[in-house]
Each structure stands twice: as structure tokens, then as C-alpha cells.
């Protein structure tokens, strides 16, 4: 049986936690930052967790994580 390929884009975006969840970076903090308030940018800084509804998709993309 051949090995399952990991989706490389997903491997760069998600990190598995010890409890089995996945950490992710929040969107909207790359460019066009001048019109966004300091508060909004500050709240986008901490890492988020992948939601339960999307967890199956991430697990399918990362078979060896």
C-alpha cells in the first residue's frame, strides 16, 4: 500500500497540540494594516484553534500529524 501524501500547505499552517487539537494563525494581519485599529490587530495576534467542524478536513490533510 502506498504512503499517503501530506498536503504541504496545511503542514505549514497547522501545528498539532498535545491534546489532539490543531493551532492556527488568525487571518487579516498580513497587509493593509493602517486602516485596522490597534485593538483589532492586537486581538488577531494570538493563535487560534481549529474549530470542531473543520477538524476533520485538517486531519485528512495531515495524515501523519
Curated annotation (Swiss-Prot):
GO terms for biological process: translation. The keyword NADP does not apply. The keyword Ribosomal protein applies. One of its GO terms (cellular component) is cytosolic large ribosomal subunit. One of its GO terms (molecular function) is structural constituent of ribosome. It comes from the Bacteria. Keywords: Ribonucleoprotein, Ribosomal protein. InterPro entries: Ribosomal_bL35, Ribosomal_bL35-like, Ribosomal_bL35_CS, Ribosomal_bL35_sf. Belongs to the bacterial ribosomal protein bL35 family. PANTHER family: 54S RIBOSOMAL PROTEIN BL35M, LARGE RIBOSOMAL SUBUNIT PROTEIN BL35M. NCBIfam families: rpmI_bact. This is Large ribosomal subunit protein bL35.
